[in-house]
């Protein structure tokens, strides 16, 4: 089963923001119980082959509708108990990357997905 890549971006990991500078899957930094098994919920967005033991539904990135654009604030929320996701807000130059679905499904490429300013999910 795949594990997190330390060369990946913080937004592609399952870890708390403070852990993302060095490694995305330090056990003590995990936001999800399945962090050590390939990132679980939220992990693998943009990679498409994150672990063989999880279903597609466990790898959906749930975005809050009040998120900001990529590159600001903190990494995305990953909790499945969030308010259902809305299509992410985009930089104007990336508008074409948004399709009529949800962030983390078919809506956006990883570079376009929104980031939550506060972990309020």
Swiss-Prot record:
Give the UniProt family note: Belongs to the KRTAP type 1 family.
Role noted for this protein: In the hair cortex, hair keratin intermediate filaments are embedded in an interfilamentous matrix, consisting of hair keratin-associated proteins (KRTAP), which are essential for the formation of a rigid and resistant hair shaft through their extensive disulfide bond cross-linking with abundant cysteine residues of hair keratins. The matrix proteins include the high-sulfur and high-glycine-tyrosine keratins.
Q: Quaternary form?
A: Interacts with hair keratins.
Can you cite an annotated GO cellular component? cytosol
Keyword presence, Cytoplasm: no
The organism encoding this protein is Homo sapiens (Human)
By its UniProt entry, which InterPro entries does this protein fall under? Answer: KAP
Query: Which tissues is it found in, per the record?
Result: Expressed in the middle/upper portions of the hair cortex, in the region termed the keratogenous zone.
The molecule here is called Keratin-associated protein 1-4
A Pfam family the protein falls into: Keratin_B2
Q: Which domain of life is it from?
A: Eukaryota
Q: Which UniProt keywords apply?
A: Keratin, Repeat
Do the record's keywords include NADP?
no
């Amino acid at each position: 089963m795949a594990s997190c890549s330390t060369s990946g971006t913080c937004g592609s990991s399952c870890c708390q923001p403070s852990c993302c500078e060095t490694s995305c899957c330090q056990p003590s930094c995990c936001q999800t119980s399945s962090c050590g098994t390939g990132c679980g919920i939220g992990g693998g967005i943009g990679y498409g082959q994150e672990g063989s033991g999880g279903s597609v539904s466990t790898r959906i990135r749930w975005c809050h509708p009040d998120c900001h654009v990529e590159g600001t604030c903190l990494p995305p929320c990953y909790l499945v108990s969030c308010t259902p996701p809305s299509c992410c807000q985009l930089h104007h130059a990336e508008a074409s990357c948004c399709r009529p679905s949800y962030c983390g499904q078919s809506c956006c490429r990883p570079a376009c997905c929104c980031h939550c300013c506060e972990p309020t999910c």
